[in-house]
Curated annotation (Swiss-Prot):
It holds the Pfam family CSN8_PSD8_EIF3K. Component of the 26S proteasome, a multiprotein complex involved in the ATP-dependent degradation of ubiquitinated proteins. This complex plays a key role in the maintenance of protein homeostasis by removing misfolded or damaged proteins, which could impair cellular functions, and by removing proteins whose functions are no longer required. Therefore, the proteasome participates in numerous cellular processes, including cell cycle progression, apoptosis, or DNA damage repair. It comes from Bos taurus (Bovine). One of its GO terms (cellular component) is proteasome regulatory particle, lid subcomplex. GO terms for biological process: proteasome-mediated ubiquitin-dependent protein catabolic process. InterPro entries: 26S_Psome_Rpn12, CSN8_PSD8_EIF3K, PCI_dom. Signal peptide: none annotated. Belongs to the proteasome subunit S14 family. This is 26S proteasome non-ATPase regulatory subunit 8.
Amino acid sequence: MAATAVNGVAGTSSSGSAAASGAILQAAAGMYEQLKGEWNRKSPNLSKCGEELGRLKLVLLELNFLPTTGTKLTKQQLILARDIQEIGAQWSILRKDIPSFERYMAQLKCYYFDYKEQLPESAYMHQLLGLNLLFLLSQNRVAEFHTELERLPAKDIQTNVYIKHPVSLEQYLMEGSYNKVFLAKGNIPAESYTFFIDILLDTIRDEIAGCIEKAYEKILFTEATRILFFNTPKKMTDYAKKRGWVLGINNYYSFASQQQKPEDTTIPSTELAKQVIEYARQLEMIV
C-alpha cells in the first residue's frame, strides 16, 4: 500500500513536471513570436530585441533546450532554440557586439552540424556560416578560418554565394590583391556582411599606410587617397588625422621624421615597401 502511495505521488509529480514544462514551452513560443515580430519590422528596436533575447535565453536554459545540456530534445524544441539564436546572431551584428556574435555562433554550429540529420536546413544557415568565416578573417584568425571551412561540403564552398564571398576574400589576401578586397565590398551577398568587411578593410588600410610612412618622405594628397582606396577627400582627411598625418605645403603629407636613418637600417625596408606599393598599383591597373 505504501508502494502504491509512493508510485501515485511519483506519477503525480511527473505529470506535474511535464505540465509545468509544457506551460514554459508555450510561454517561450509566445515570447519568440513577440521577438520575431519586432525583429522583422523595417526598423527594429534593438534594445527591445536584446531584452527579449535575454529573457528567452533564461527560458531555454530552464527548459534544457540548449544542446550543451545533454538533454534529448524534440525537433520542435530544437527548431525553436535555433531560430531564437539565429536572431541573436544577427542582432549582435547590428549592435556591433563581436563577443555576443561569437557566442551565438558557437551555439548555432551545434544545430547546423550536430543535428543536421534531425532538422530541416535553416534558411539563414549559409548566411551565418559565411558571416562567421568573414568574422574570422577580420580578426586575422586564418587557422580557425580553414578549420571552419573544412566542416563545409565542397559544393557549398564552390557554389554558395554566402560561403564563396569570404573564401574569395581570403584568396585575395593571400595573393596580396588588396584592390580586389576593396572592390568586393560592393558585391556583398547580404547587408550584414558590411560590418566585418569594414573591419577587414580598415586593417588593410593600416598596413598600406604603414608601408607609405616607411617608403615615402612625402606623398601627394590625391595619391594617398587613391592608394588607400578612399572614394572621397573627406574620408582621406579623417583617416590622416587619425594617423597623425599633417597636410603641408603643396598638398603633401610628409613623413621625413618617420624615415629610418641609414646607419640604423639592417634590411632594405624602404625599398621593399616601395615594391609592395608598386605591385599593388600594377594589380589595380590589371583589374
